[in-house]
């Protein structure tokens, strides 16, 4: 039974397409190798897959460059001359641009002005004034930014100073600020243990001011600790 004819069209499935490409590429390279051995032919094959991957085959008796050189000599064409001419044209254009830029730079530095006409000098003057204005505006912008940053730092320092003043003021208003009620154990407050050297301990008793004149007793009592 005869085999059905396979329709030649693009394989839509990417996996199947890559598998088919790999199989047929190997088959072509095998045929090229057979031509090289059986017929003493010089074969060069360059293949690019749909993913851009390069595959090539070259007969062991030659090189890719030799194949291209022989191709050019046989057909009488130069594959590289066109590209070389394009490169030379681009190089010339770049040199001209570079020359003009250097000339403009020297003119803006006050050099090579003798060949300029009055109109050209006026245009150059306007360009330099415009450039000077842009530089000056940028300078003022940088200065203003630095001033604003400095003002923010000053405001932060002033706020810290204000908070500290409020804290000290609160301490002055609160008579018991920082005192610890430990039941009269002044030795533990002062950090002395039994058997230490005699010291005078200050006992603070918040009695009314009138007691000073009534003879009840002073709010300051000195006790000798032994």
Curated annotation (Swiss-Prot):
MADS-box domain mapped to chain residues: 1-61
Tissue and organ expression note: Expressed during flower development in stamens and petals.
Domain K-box: 84-174
A single BP term in Gene Ontology: positive regulation of transcription by RNA polymerase II
Superkingdom to which the source organism belongs: Eukaryota
PANTHER family in UniProt: SERUM RESPONSE FACTOR HOMOLOG (PTHR48019)
Functional description taken from the UniProt entry: Probable transcription factor involved in flower development.
Protein name as catalogued: Agamous-like MADS-box protein AP3
Species, as recorded: Vitis vinifera (Grape)
């Amino acid at each position: 039974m005869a085999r059905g004819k396979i329709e030649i069209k693009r394989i839509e499935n990417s996996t199947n397409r890559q598998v088919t490409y790999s199989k047929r590429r190997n088959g072509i390279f095998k045929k090229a190798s057979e031509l090289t051995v059986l017929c003493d032919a010089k074969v060069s094959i360059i293949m690019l897959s749909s993913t851009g991957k390069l595959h090539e085959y070259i007969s062991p008796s030659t090189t890719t460059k030799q194949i291209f050189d022989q191709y050019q000599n046989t057909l009488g064409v130069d594959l590289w001359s066109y590209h070389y001419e394009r490169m030379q044209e681009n190089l010339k254009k770049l040199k001209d641009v570079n020359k003009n830029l250097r000339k403009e730079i020297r003119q803006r530095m006050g050099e090579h002005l003798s060949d300029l006409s009055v109109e050209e000098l006026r245009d150059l003057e306007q360009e330099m004034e415009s450039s000077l204005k842009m530089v000056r505006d940028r300078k003022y912008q940088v200065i203003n930014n630095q001033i604003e940053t400095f003002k923010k730092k000053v405001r932060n320092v002033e706020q810290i100073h204000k908070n500290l003043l409020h804290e000290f003021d609160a301490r002055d208003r609160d008579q018991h600020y920082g005192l610890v009620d430990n039941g009269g154990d002044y030795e533990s407050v002062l950090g002395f243990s039994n058997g230490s050297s005699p010291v005078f301990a200050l006992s603070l008793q918040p009695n009314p001011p009138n007691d000073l004149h009534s003879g009840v007793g002073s709010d300051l009592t000195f006790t000798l600790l032994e």
